[in-house]
Design a protein with these regions (language model features):
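Central regulatory/effector-binding core of bacterial HTH transcription factors
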Residues: 1-29
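Flexible hinge/capping segments at coil-to-helix
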Residues: 30-41, 45-71
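Secondary-structure junction motif
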Residues: 65-88
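C-terminal effector-binding regulatory domain of bacterial HTH transcription factors
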Residues: 122-131, 140-193
Length: 193
């Protein structure tokens, strides 16, 4: 779990760490951040929450109980970014809420229990979307794309075995991502028939 403000100030790299997979850039500029993939993040809530507290656009989030992520805290709020639907323009929205979580999984659990709106990666909520536990808050595709990176020390400061493990790990992650993106769920279902 990232420390408070790590998303905006950069993530600390522990001395006993060889590789750190993160959506936040490193705080120390002497570290390397190798791009792995991008993923979309948007707002989700339970149908029950949305029936009681309707929302249609990100600028309405200020009137809702948003489930905050500790690493994204600025004072008593999070800044959630969304691309303006149909454009590449990005806008920031300051959101507040009754709950602060140190990871997305606990934030998702609160949202599943009708306690607010969660800002989560689309891949993290696929099963919730399929079974109707969570639904997107917006009809239009308001989302924010984040980079997933592997952070490590420059190669000249690493033992050979760490370089080897890092190269193999990144190769395998990229290979699995490429495979998962080749077959969308509906294609996978068709190929099983």
């Amino acid at each position: 779990n990232l420390e408070r403000n790590a998303f905006y100030e950069g993530v600390e790299f522990p001395d006993d760490c060889d590789v750190l997979i993160s959506y936040a850039p490193p705080k120390d500029e002497s570290l390397v951040a190798s791009f792995i993939t991008q993923y979309a993040v948007t707002a989700y809530a339970s149908q029950r929450y949305l029936e009681k507290h309707p929302i249609s656009r990100p600028d309405e989030l200020e009137h809702h109980s948003c489930i905050l992520i500790d690493s994204m805290m600025i004072d008593d709020a999070n800044i959630w970014r969304f691309n303006v639907a149909g454009s590449k323009e990005v806008r920031d929205y300051r959101v507040k809420g009754n709950y602060v979580c140190d990871n997305t999984q606990s934030a998702l659990e609160l949202a599943r229990n009708h306690l607010g709106i969660v800002f989560a990666p689309d891949k993290s909520v696929q099963s919730d979307l399929q079974d109707g536990t969570l639904v997107p808050c917006f009809q239009q595709p308001y989302e924010w794309w984040l980079d997933l990176v592997a952070i490590f020390r420059k190669r000249e400061y690493q033992p050979w075995r760490v370089q080897y493990v890092l190269d193999e790990m990144l190769r395998e992650i990229r290979h699995q991502l490429a495979q998962s993106q080749q077959l969308r769920p509906e294609q996978a279902a068709e190929s099983e028939d």
